[in-house]
Regions:
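Divalent metal-coordination and catalytic microenvironments
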Residues: 8, 21, 26, 47, ...
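C-terminal cap of metal-dependent C-N hydrolases
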Residues: 8, 325-329, 385-451
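Histidine/acidic residue-rich metal-binding segments in metalloenzymes
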Residues: 132-311
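Histidine-rich, glycine-flanked metal-binding segment
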Residues: 1-53
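His/Asp/Glu-enriched, well-ordered alpha-helical/loop segment
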Residues: 201-232, 284, 305, 309-311, ...
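Metal-associated gating/positioning segment near the N- to mid-region
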Residues: 45-115, 132
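Short, surface-exposed connector motifs at secondary-structure boundaries
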Residues: 86-90, 116-121, 146-147, 225-233, ...
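Alpha-helix-loop-beta-strand connector modules within alpha/beta enzyme cores
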Residues: 102-118, 166-180
Length: 457
């Protein structure tokens, strides 16, 4: 059966254009104006924007953290992703300390296979470095994993500068790409100790012990290590002006640096941590913390100028009951917020509709660039002949109010509660099959594991 999406505006990384899309099976056959409806079922998308299926390259489903497990597993999290127009997620396989990379990959396949409703892949977390892990890197490429992650903070996961240098050298041999969580762990620990010694324990202590300059310091240190190795790296969830300055300096030196940010750093500000209602403030605890309005504006400018390549979510959801476990100890509040269900509508509302970015930029940061960065292009990330028929149908006139009660994810709150979006996602198609209709997730979708190639950006 052929499908003909007729009457819409197709959005690519270069911008919007009027075109029809002809689909057969799982693939796109043609994209051009006025395709005749011969032997095809017509999907009327008059007045709609048609995006490639969004790619969220930074999710944490079914993750054990802070003595609990994220509210969303791969089943609920992927359904929430589909509702938000995301047809592909890349989650993080996380071996426990002392385990092999194979152990971590095996566990994440057990969590996701047969449960994930959208297509999916994995990054591999490197939390240690030795000869065994170095040998395993080769095996990961054979398994379709071409991207990795390291942490400069969190005692259970962080890796030192020497190990990071050695790991990056190995990844350079293989043509791999690595994302790094950049915060200065030592200074954070000292600031936390100072707060506790002073008897301070409010949620506001979270951003005050993880300041922007200590994120920027870690970004600068990472980039100097990467410069020594001569390898491009990804700065994940970039939050502030100072970090952007470090990145700009590295690019001026001739380095290739890729930058990711997230909706929470674009549309929220740090006033959320100073709410007198402890639980309301705790809902926004994530690391790095949400920053100031000036940082939001700087990130939007960076997207517009092409200095930020991707907008992911760092989706790491918890219930209010789980957040309450940190009452009395701000460092024990589980860090993370839900985001996969609202990302596309927030970027359109606060970016495109407010004329901070264009439709082409929205397509680049949500679909095209993540596909290229993580070895999925042109199968994913573009509406073109031969690509997977992953299609997001966006109605720019169907405004709606974000409410936790309407969400399909497992968290019982939404950090954007009450926000009014300009337009909404009405349909989502995954490999030529409808998975969202009239804004509702349809049952029965089963995602495919996606082995990935090398970076193409």
């Amino acid at each position: 059966m052929r499908l003909l999406f007729k009457g819409g505006t197709v959005v690519t990384g270069k911008g919007p254009r009027r075109a029809d899309i002809l689909v057969e099976g799982e693939k796109i056959l043609d994209v051009c104006r006025d395709i005749p409806a011969i032997g095809a079922q017509v999907v009327d998308v008059t007045g709609m924007l048609l995006f490639p299926g969004f790619i969220d390259a930074h999710t944490h489903f079914d993750l054990d953290v802070c003595n609990t497990t994220t509210a969303d597993d791969f089943a609920s999290g992927s359904r929430a992703a589909l509702r938000g127009g995301t047809t592909t997620i890349i989650d993080f396989a996380c071996p426990n300390k002392g385990e092999t990379l194979h152990d971590g990959l095996r566990l994440w396949h057990e969590k996701a296979d047969g449960k994930c409703a959208c297509d999916y892949g994995f990054h591999m977390t490197i939390d240690d470095w030795n000869e065994t892990i170095a040998r395993e890197i080769d095996d990961m490429y054979a398994e379709g994993i071409s991207s990795f992650k390291m942490y400069m903070t969190y005692p259970a996961m962080m890796i030192g500068d020497e190990a990071m240098y050695k790991a990056l050298k190995k990844l350079k041999e293989k043509g791999g790409i690595c994302g790094v969580h950049c915060e200065n762990a030592g200074v954070i620990d000292a600031l936390i100790a100072e707060k506790k010694a002073a008897g301070e324990n409010g949620v506001y202590c979270h951003p005050e012990t993880r300041p922007d300059i200590m994120e920027a310091e870690a970004v600068g240190r990472l980039l100097r290590i990467a410069e020594q190795v001569d390898i491009p790296v990804v700065i994940v969830y970039t939050t502030n002006i100072e970090a952007l300055d470090e990145i700009a300096n590295a690019r001026w030196r001739g380095q290739k640096v890729f930058v990711e940010t997230c909706p929470q750093y674009l549309v929220l500000d740090d006033s959320v941590y100073y709410n007198e209602d402890w639980l309301q403030a705790a809902k926004y605890v994530c690391s790095p913390p949400i920053r100031k309005k000036a940082d939001c504006n700087a990130l939007w400018r960076a997207i517009r100028r092409g200095e930020v390549q991707t907008v992911s979510t760092d989706h790491c959801s918890f219930t209010t009951a789980q957040k309450l476990a940190g009452r009395g100890n701000f460092t024990a509040i589980p860090g993370g917020i839900p985001g996969v269900e609202t990302r596309g509508e927030l970027i359109y509302t606060f970016g495109v509709a407010k004329k901070k970015i264009g439709l082409g930029a929205m397509c680049r940061v949500l679909a095209e660039n993540p596909a290229k960065l993580y070895g999925l292009y042109p199968r994913k990330g573009v509406l073109a002949p031969g690509s997977d028929a992953d299609i997001v149908v966006y109605d720019p006139k169907a405004d709606h109010v974000i409410r936790a009660e309407d969400m399909v994810g497992a968290a019982d709150y939404n950090p954007y509660e009450g926000f009014v979006t300009k337009g909404s996602i009405r349909q989502v198609w995954l490999r030529g099959k409808p998975v969202v209709s009239s804004g509702k997730v349809l049952p029965g979708s089963v995602g495919k594991y996606l082995p990935r190639g090398k970076c193409q950006l």
